[in-house]
A protein has these predicted regions:
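Helix-to-loop junction immediately C-terminal to a conserved catalytic motif
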Residues: 65, 348
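ABC ATPase NBD Q-loop/coupling interface
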Residues: 79-90, 357-380
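Conserved ABC ATPase "signature" region
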Residues: 127-144, 417-435
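Conserved ABC ATPase signature
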Residues: 149-153, 157, 439-443, 447
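ABC ATPase C-loop
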Residues: 166-167, 456-457
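Conserved catalytic motifs of ABC-family nucleotide-binding domains
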Residues: 170, 460
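Catalytic Walker B motif of ABC-type/P-loop ATPase nucleotide-binding domains
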Residues: 174-178, 464-468
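Conserved beta-strand-loop-alpha-helix hinge in the C-terminal portion
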Residues: 230-260, 506, 516-520
Length: 520
């Protein structure tokens, strides 16, 4: 053990966690997010926390981190103890890493970002920078200087930076809430390896939430599965608790029925023809490629680009000519930071191209508009091109879940009764009917994602652009999402999706365009 490892290991001190018939109801909600939760986690244990979407996993993690708030923020039942004291009094004992790398990057420089938490603990300056050096070393970012810009980090590097910031506070409990949900495969590997180094060197107690669990099975020694509170009986509680082999071997069928992911479970196949393209190194501007795209346009193209360059401050891709077709799903893949989300926003007409244009089939062009989607008004896009944002909250415009889904149909001239009928059907498909009157912003992450998809599907666009449509989904809702996307495809729409989800690409038989950093 190095001096760095010995210092951190001797200082942190793993702590235990206990839940005693614990439950929490958010102040704005009628039902409890979770209820009747009982378990004891011993110091140094490594626990994978599972459950269906909406089972309260993130609420429990926030409770353990002491950030749920007081009585004015909600109602608590039972006890939740961290290190033997009420979790709300134990905030300095926990380190929490969330799923969004960008949301956790606070300051401009790597060193300052890691030091931020320590500064809030009022530690001496020398001690702070000592911890910063130690933590960056443990997560494998010690090669970066303290002055290195956080803007230049990839998604995986940002998550490792967030992990370093949590580790620098010397918590006895490390909480990871879907830390790889928004990462490419390389980023997933980086975070997995960094966490392995952390728990091997510091021996901290670990609780990790993740829907796709294969990444973590080699690091955990225990699995706890939360039940989803029933709308009538509000039972919830813990469905299963034991080693991975015990839980998945004895309770696999029960867990799958409840919506949890279970290793080895088959997924539905909704494939059509499968093709592979590559967007990078000028591949799509060759004469033969351009001729092929022109032939495709004359057949069934609904959206296409002409010599497109996209980006914000600088070009992320240039001279792109690509067509999207009726009844086809296209996956935009590639590592974090190459511009997949930026390209998606450009294709949806929401971000101005740096050069070139995005066009549609002639029959889709609104009256008195040119065939350049960025020049259209928002009302022109409705029913033609729909966008599901990476952050669901960015598209919510009403104060109730039901009204959110009804916005599209109402804006397209449907009566209120017709719009609500469409909304109710879509909420049922998305397992959101019990939240019809709830504020969209109070839903869980997975529920918000399903609502954002439902609101776009209700408008029945000819082109549907989706940014990470399956993040935060359990086994049941993931399969339902795949069925819905396949339905949209089979009804004649073109679907364009940014994704790192290889299972989704395979299930839909999607055409793949790899967005390459070679376009810079």
């Amino acid at each position: 053990m190095t001096d760095t490892e010995r210092t951190v290991a001797s200082t942190a001190g793993a702590i235990g966690v206990s839940a005693r018939d614990w439950g929490w109801r958010h102040a704005s909600r009628k039902d409890f997010a979770l209820r009747h939760v009982d378990f004891d986690i011993r110091p140094g244990e490594r626990v994978l926390l599972l459950g269906a979407s909406g089972a309260g996993k993130s609420t429990l993690m926030s409770g353990l981190a002491g950030v749920l708030g007081g009585d004015d923020e909600g109602e608590q039942e039972g006890e939740l103890l961290v290190g033997g004291v009420d979790a709300r009094s134990a905030r300095g004992m926990c380190g929490l890493v969330l799923q969004d790398p960008d949301a956790q990057t606070i300051l401009e420089r790597v060193g300052d970002d890691v030091a931020f938490g320590c500064e809030n603990l009022n530690l001496p300056k020398d001690e702070i920078w000592k911890r910063v050096r130690e933590s960056l070393d443990i997560v494998g970012l010690d090669y970066m200087g303290f002055e290195h810009s956080t803007r230049k980090l990839s998604g995986g590097q940002r998550q490792r930076l967030a992990l370093a910031g949590a580790l620098a506070m010397h918590p006895g409990l490390l909480l990871l809430d879907e830390p790889t949900a928004n990462l490419d495969p390389d980023g997933v590997r980086q975070v997995h390896d960094a966490v392995r180094h952390v728990i091997e060197r510091t021996h901290e107690t670990l609780v990790v939430v993740e829907h796709h669990i294969d990444v973590w099975l080699d690091l955990v020694d225990r699995v706890i599965v939360l039940g989803k509170p029933d709308a009538v009986h509000h039972v919830g509680g813990v469905l299963a608790d034991g080693t991975p082999d015990e839980v998945f071997g004895r309770y696999g069928d029960l867990l799958a029925e409840s919506g949890a992911w279970v290793p080895g479970r088959a997924i539905a196949d909704h494939t059509k023809a499968h093709a592979m393209d590559r967007m990078g190194d000028g591949a799509d501007v060759r004469p033969e490629t351009t001729a092929r795209i022109r032939r495709e346009r004359s057949r069934d193209t609904v959206l296409y680009t002409e010599d497109l360059s996209f980006g914000r401050a600088f070009a992320l891709g240039e001279h792109i000519n690509v067509a999207f077709h009726v009844g086809e799903v296209t996956a935009l893949t590639g590592r974090n930071g190459v511009g997949k989300s930026t390209l998606a926003l450009t294709l949806a007409g929401l971000l101005k191209p740096l050069a070139g244009r995005v066009c549609v089939a002639d029959a889709m062009v609104p009256e008195r508009r040119e065939n350049n989607v960025f020049t259209w008004k928002s009302g022109d896009l409705l029913g033609r091109i729909g966008m599901v944002f990476q952050e669901p909250e960015h598209q919510f415009v009403t104060s109730s879940v039901r009204d959110e889904v009804a916005v599209g149909p109402r804006s397209m001239g449907r009566t209120q009764e017709e719009a609500y009928a469409i909304a109710d059907g879509m909420l049922g498909r998305m397992h959101l009917e019990r939240f019809a009157k709830a504020n969209p912003f109070t839903l869980s992450g997975g529920e918000k994602r399903r609502l954002s998809v439902a609101s776009m599907l209700a408008a029945a666009p000819k082109v549907l652009v989706m940014d990470e449509p399956t993040f935060g989904q359990d086994y049941a809702t993931w399969n339902e999402m795949v069925r819905l996307i396949a339905m949209v495809r089979d009804e004649g729409s073109a679907v364009i999706m940014v994704t790192h989800d290889d299972a989704l690409v395979k299930a839909l038989g999607a055409r793949v365009i790899n967005v390459s950093e070679g376009e810079r």
